């Protein structure tokens, strides 16, 4: 009897679902379920041919997946095959672990498999994974004897399929052994660290993992400067021609300028300002209000008189000072008045001479 390969169905599909699907075309002897595919054994090959023609590329399941149904490429043998023919057809090396499929996954327990395989040798471990199981024997001869006796036998009204596992458990540690996790963990500890971990553990990772190196970098005089040139204010202070005159010290000590001078150039404020700040204030400071009033309004008569007197007294030490109107009157009274003649004084001098 040649099995029919059926694949591409949903992973949650059950053996009873496939059996019900193929039963429409003939009698189904058994279904060997795998992960994602199955082998369907039908009693008559002509019925199997009909099933292949009808079900290949057939949309099946909730998602409408297209089935792949065809003859198996290698003849897996019939129900009356022996263990020797089974091993020769599969080409697997004998091992201590047997691979069991096609049992009732919903109702079969570990104890049921132990009772079925115990008569042929001492069992080390039994593990069930969804719809397949692994039976591990203590000796390889016991596993061979169990395979010859239990393959195509009935377990809880199901015809099971038994074959050798791909690798031997205790020598290979391939995952079929119950010691899988204990075998893998020491290997992981002995394994060399990954390049990512080596990179993170190295002192050159990122900006430096060592706090000492970080402190050494911060205390360096070049830390944080990069390629930026010093601010104009710093260049003026570092210049040998920088002078600390008395007026500058007085302005720095004044409470008005202290708030501006205390701004740190490291915060980016001093770099955009022209050096030094107090010079800009001197140039940009507007004259006092009384000067604006004096410039905007027309000068009074005594200012005109003062301008004339200023041209004569440029050599005087008082030249350039702002004089009050009272001072101007005192000066004019002391040195003689050269302004416009008073009509009272001019009347006797401009009167026509008396006729003799």
Swiss-Prot record:
<dbReference type="InterPro" id="IPR050907">
    <property type="entry name" value="SRSF"/>
</dbReference>
<feature type="compositionally biased region" description="Basic and acidic residues">
    <location>
        <begin position="238"/>
        <end position="253"/>
    </location>
</feature>
<feature type="modified residue" description="Phosphoserine">
    <location>
        <position position="309"/>
    </location>
</feature>
<dbReference type="GO" id="GO:0003729">
    <property type="term" value="F:mRNA binding"/>
</dbReference>
<keyword id="KW-0507">mRNA processing</keyword>
<dbReference type="InterPro" id="IPR000504">
    <property type="entry name" value="RRM_dom"/>
</dbReference>
<feature type="compositionally biased region" description="Basic and acidic residues">
    <location>
        <begin position="268"/>
        <end position="306"/>
    </location>
</feature>
<feature type="repeat" description="2">
    <location>
        <begin position="279"/>
        <end position="290"/>
    </location>
</feature>
<feature type="modified residue" description="Phosphoserine">
    <location>
        <position position="210"/>
    </location>
</feature>
<feature type="repeat" description="4; truncated">
    <location>
        <begin position="303"/>
        <end position="307"/>
    </location>
</feature>
<feature type="modified residue" description="Phosphoserine">
    <location>
        <position position="239"/>
    </location>
</feature>
<protein>
    <recommendedName>
        <fullName>Serine/arginine-rich splicing factor RS41</fullName>
    </recommendedName>
</protein>
<feature type="modified residue" description="Phosphoserine">
    <location>
        <position position="347"/>
    </location>
</feature>
<comment type="function">
    <text>Required for constitutive and alternative pre-mRNA splicing. Involved in primary miRNA processing and pri-miRNA biogenesis. Binds both intronless and intron-containing pri-miRNAs.</text>
</comment>
<dbReference type="InterPro" id="IPR035979">
    <property type="entry name" value="RBD_domain_sf"/>
</dbReference>
<comment type="similarity">
    <text>Belongs to the splicing factor SR family. RS subfamily.</text>
</comment>
<dbReference type="GO" id="GO:0000398">
    <property type="term" value="P:mRNA splicing, via spliceosome"/>
</dbReference>
<dbReference type="GO" id="GO:0005681">
    <property type="term" value="C:spliceosomal complex"/>
</dbReference>
<feature type="repeat" description="3">
    <location>
        <begin position="291"/>
        <end position="302"/>
    </location>
</feature>
<dbReference type="GO" id="GO:0008380">
    <property type="term" value="P:RNA splicing"/>
</dbReference>
<keyword id="KW-0694">RNA-binding</keyword>
<feature type="modified residue" description="Phosphoserine">
    <location>
        <position position="192"/>
    </location>
</feature>
<feature type="domain" description="RRM 1">
    <location>
        <begin position="2"/>
        <end position="74"/>
    </location>
</feature>
<dbReference type="InterPro" id="IPR012677">
    <property type="entry name" value="Nucleotide-bd_a/b_plait_sf"/>
</dbReference>
<keyword id="KW-0677">Repeat</keyword>
<feature type="modified residue" description="Phosphoserine">
    <location>
        <position position="194"/>
    </location>
</feature>
<comment type="subunit">
    <text>Component of the spliceosome. Interacts with RCF3 and CPL1. Interacts with DRB1/HYL1 and SE.</text>
</comment>
<feature type="modified residue" description="Phosphoserine">
    <location>
        <position position="274"/>
    </location>
</feature>
<feature type="compositionally biased region" description="Basic and acidic residues">
    <location>
        <begin position="168"/>
        <end position="186"/>
    </location>
</feature>
<keyword id="KW-0747">Spliceosome</keyword>
<feature type="domain" description="RRM 2">
    <location>
        <begin position="96"/>
        <end position="167"/>
    </location>
</feature>
<feature type="region of interest" description="4 X 12 AA tandem repeats of [KE]-[GK]-R -[GR]-E-S-R-S-P-P-P-Y">
    <location>
        <begin position="267"/>
        <end position="307"/>
    </location>
</feature>
<feature type="region of interest" description="Disordered">
    <location>
        <begin position="168"/>
        <end position="356"/>
    </location>
</feature>
<dbReference type="Pfam" id="PF00076">
    <property type="entry name" value="RRM_1"/>
</dbReference>
<feature type="repeat" description="1">
    <location>
        <begin position="267"/>
        <end position="278"/>
    </location>
</feature>
<dbReference type="GO" id="GO:0016607">
    <property type="term" value="C:nuclear speck"/>
</dbReference>
<feature type="modified residue" description="Phosphoserine">
    <location>
        <position position="324"/>
    </location>
</feature>
<dbReference type="GO" id="GO:0031053">
    <property type="term" value="P:primary miRNA processing"/>
</dbReference>
<feature type="region of interest" description="Disordered">
    <location>
        <begin position="73"/>
        <end position="92"/>
    </location>
</feature>
<feature type="modified residue" description="Phosphoserine">
    <location>
        <position position="342"/>
    </location>
</feature>
<keyword id="KW-0597">Phosphoprotein</keyword>
<feature type="modified residue" description="Phosphoserine">
    <location>
        <position position="351"/>
    </location>
</feature>
């Amino acid at each position: 009897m040649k099995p029919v390969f059926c694949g591409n169905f949903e992973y949650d599909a059950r053996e009873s679902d496939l059996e019900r699907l193929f039963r429409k075309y003939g009698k189904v002897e058994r279904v060997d379920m795998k992960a994602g595919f199955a082998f369907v054994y039908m009693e008559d090959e002509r019925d199997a041919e009909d099933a292949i023609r009808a079900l290949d590329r057939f949309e099946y399941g909730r998602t409408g997946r297209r089935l792949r149904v065809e003859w198996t490429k290698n003849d897996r043998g019939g129900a009356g095959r022996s263990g020797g023919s089974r091993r020769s057809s599969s080409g697997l090396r004998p091992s201590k672990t047997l691979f069991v499929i096609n049992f009732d996954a919903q109702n079969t327990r570990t104890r049921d498999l132990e009772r079925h395989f115990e008569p042929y040798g001492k069992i080390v471990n039994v593990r069930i994974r969804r719809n397949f199981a692994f039976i591990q024997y203590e000796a390889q001869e016991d596993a061979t004897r169990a395979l010859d006796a239990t393959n195509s036998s009935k377990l809880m009204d199901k015809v099971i399929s038994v074959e050798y596992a791909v690798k031997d458990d205790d020598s290979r540690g391939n995952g079929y052994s119950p010691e899988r996790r204990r075998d893998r963990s020491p290997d992981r500890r002995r394994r060399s660290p990954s390049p990512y971990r080596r990179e993170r553990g190295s002192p050159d990772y990122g900006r430096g993992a060592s706090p000492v190196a970080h402190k050494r970098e911060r205390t360096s005089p070049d830390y944080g400067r990069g390629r930026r040139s010093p601010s104009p204010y710093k260049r003026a202070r570092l210049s040998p021609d920088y002078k600390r005159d008395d007026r500058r010290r007085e302005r720095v000590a004044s409470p008005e300028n202290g708030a501006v001078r205390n701004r740190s150039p490291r915060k980016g404020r001093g770099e955009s300002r022209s050096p030094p700040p107090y010079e800009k204030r001197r140039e940009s400071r507007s004259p006092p209000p009384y000067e604006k009033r004096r410039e905007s309004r027309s000068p009074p008569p005594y200012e005109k008189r003062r301008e004339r007197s200023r041209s004569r007294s440029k050599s005087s030490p008082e030249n350039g000072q702002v004089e009050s109107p009272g001072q101007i009157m005192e000066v004019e009274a002391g040195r003689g008045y050269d302004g416009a003649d008073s009509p009272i004084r001019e009347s006797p001098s401009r009167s026509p001479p008396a006729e003799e």
